[in-house]
Amino acid sequence: MNPIIKQWDTAKSLKRCQYKEALAIYETLCPKVETELSDTFDRAMFFGDYFGLLADVAQYDKAEAMAAKALKYITENGYTTLNYIFYNYGNMYLHQAKWEEAIPWLEKALNRNSDGWINEKRKAYYGTALGGALFHLGRIDEAEEELLKAVEAGKATVANKDWEPFFYLKEIYKQKGEEKLMAKYEKMYLTRLKKLKEEDLIYPLSEHRANKQALEDWKKLSNL
């Protein structure tokens, strides 16, 4: 196995709370990728992964530079199965509360791949992100539609453990005055939240209002 691939796999295998160790690996590998990694598909994936992690820790200028490299390889080679890189781009804007800028990238991530298929787990995560952006823009009906689709897509996957779509749905139904639906989704939200560890809610930023509220709610559930 190419040693770059091996170290990259190590970075990807680290837990979310180990992001500093992961960043150190990516920083070491970055200068070598374009000279020692011959497969341009792998290069696109590497820079896509790297900029996603950089965005998570608010290194936005550096993230933009790595994103440009990933998109260059995607465009030049016509790759159509790397939707997660578009999601990472949209997520970078979400971290900065740039909801309008995030939406086109999240919509692009949700487009089906060239073979007409997209992973249901990813569909759930991408749809939740899109629904959250729409919610923050006050586009409540559109947000509701995307979030319900995300919940449905994630039912049979690990995404069903995610608290975020249920948080937004209970907020939506609270705004709409639909108490029964609000109570339903609040219960689903809290059920998932209490199963988490604190590190799951503070990695590596908690800039979204949803994340901050979830952390507060988690502390109440945990009697902290």
Model-derived regions: residue spans:
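"A position-specific structural signal for the A-helix of alpha-solenoid helical repeats
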Residues: 8-9, 42, 49, 81, ...
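Structural signature of alpha-solenoid helical repeat junctions
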Residues: 2, 41-42, 81, 120-122, ...
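Residue at a conserved register position within TPR or TPR-like alpha-solenoid repeats
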Residues: 13-14, 47, 54, 93, ...
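Structural motif corresponding to the intra-repeat A-B loop/turn of tetratricopeptide repeats
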Residues: 16, 57, 96, 137, ...
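Flexible helix-coil transition and linker loops at the boundaries of alpha-helical arrays
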Residues: 30-43, 72-80, 111-120, 154-159, ...
